[in-house]
């Protein structure tokens, strides 16, 4: 975990990892680490390379040094002075359509300066190298509902939301939420896609009916105007694959801030609840956390907020505290609707441009279907 803020000098290289085939990408990874990070990595003869399963925007690999080139360069003694490994993130093809890479890097550096998360070690043309969170595992969707992890995630997310994030290139950045600004941009991109001869995808997108999705965005915007939610520095993509957990000291960190930025608190928490489904939204109704699980998360979040702000607004367990949780529950579940539209439209765009082996259009279809299901459920229960 980052204990020393951002690196004094961020190492950068014009080196580009070839992505024309999985083998060429995999084989190029040791060289990118040697080239970008320099000594002592450039004296490492071999690395153990492992692909990490997580998100579906990029490809992630862990590289652990195995042996030095020559004993006089340090041998085993120097090898022990190296970190156990580094993470290499290779950006997905055409992801610049969806992600502002400059802001992505600024997010990473700004959070690193706050000693939040892992360090950014270096950049190359189509990716970056990050600190490896030692002895950690990547959580699975089924882990998110485990009580001890629910509490830890809630507390860490609260800490992130309370950070005073300043991006040095912009000075004091205007706290403008990204939700609807991004949705407008993405749905315009989705509408402009030429599917060519791919009639299957073309017909499936026509069935989704992006015109109706636009109408739902307007409906949601009006609903959320009536739903107070503070603007915080949000992760915006807190799926299980972006949470690393170390059981030895019960510590966890969030990674991958490329969708991060100022946004509504309710969206960030609601989006995390949606991620209990992983990438299979056919079972969304079964795995979306029930009220009891949500209230456990929200209680841990609210208690951490009171602790960090030294607030005596309401005592945990008091009627005032429970009223606060009920309001937060409504806020989060309303904003969760935005998560479905956000990632639903994203899936349509990725279905056109991404080379990652994943059915993005199916994912987009399922997220938009989950929006309609959730909207109906909220209306039925008097929450919308």
Per-region residue spans from a language model:
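Catalytic-loop of the protein kinase fold
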Residues: 233-235, 240
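Active-site activation/catalytic loop segments of kinase-like enzymes and analogous catalytic loops
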Residues: 266-315, 337-355, 370
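Helical subdomain adjoining the active site within ATP-dependent kinase catalytic cores
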Residues: 201, 310-384
């Amino acid at each position: 975990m980052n204990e020393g803020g951002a690196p004094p000098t961020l190492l950068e290289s014009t080196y580009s990892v070839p992505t024309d085939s999985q083998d060429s990408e995999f084989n190029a990874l040791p060289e990118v680490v040697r080239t970008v990070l320099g000594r002592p990595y450039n004296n490492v003869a071999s690395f153990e390379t492992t692909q990490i399963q997580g998100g579906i925007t990029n490809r992630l690999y862990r590289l652990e040094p195995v042996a030095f080139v020559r004993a006089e360069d340090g041998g085993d003694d120097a090898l022990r002075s190296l970190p156990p490994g580094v993470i290499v993130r290779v950006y997905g093809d055409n992801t610049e359509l969806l992600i502002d890479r400059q802001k992505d890097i600024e997010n990473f550096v700004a959070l690193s300066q706050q000693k939040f998360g892992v360090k950014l070690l270096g950049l190359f043309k189509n990716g970056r190298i990050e600190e490896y969170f030692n002895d950690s595992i990547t959580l699975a969707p089924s882990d998110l509902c485990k009580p001890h992890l629910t509490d830890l995630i809630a507390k860490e997310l609260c800490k992130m939301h309370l950070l005073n994030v300043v991006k040095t290139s912009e000075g004091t950045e205007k706290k403008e939420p990204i939700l609807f600004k991004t949705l407008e941009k993405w749905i315009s991109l989705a509408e402009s896609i030429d599917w060519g001869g791919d009639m299957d995808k073309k017909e499936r997108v026509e069935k989704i009916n992006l015109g109706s999705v636009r109408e739902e965005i307007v409906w949601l915007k009006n609903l959320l105007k009536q739903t107070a939610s503070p603007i915080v520095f949000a992760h915006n993509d807190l799926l299980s694959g972006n949470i690393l957990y170390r059981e030895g000291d019960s510590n966890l960190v969030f990674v991958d801030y490329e969708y991060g930025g100022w946004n509504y608190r309710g969206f960030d928490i609601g989006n995390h609840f949606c991620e209990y489904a992983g990438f299979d939204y056919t079972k969304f109704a079964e795995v979306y956390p029930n009220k009891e699980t949500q209230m456990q998360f929200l209680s841990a979040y609210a208690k951490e907020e009171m602790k960090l702000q030294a607030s005596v607004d309401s005592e945990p367990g008091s009627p005032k505290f429970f009223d606060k949780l009920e309001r937060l529950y409504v806020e989060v579940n309303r904003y969760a609707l935005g998560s479905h539209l956000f990632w639903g439209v994203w899936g349509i765009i990725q279905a056109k441009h991404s080379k990652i082996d994943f059915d993005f259009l199916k994912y987009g279809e399922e997220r938009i279907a989950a929006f309609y299901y959730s909207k109906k459920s909220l209306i039925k229960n008097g929450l919308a």
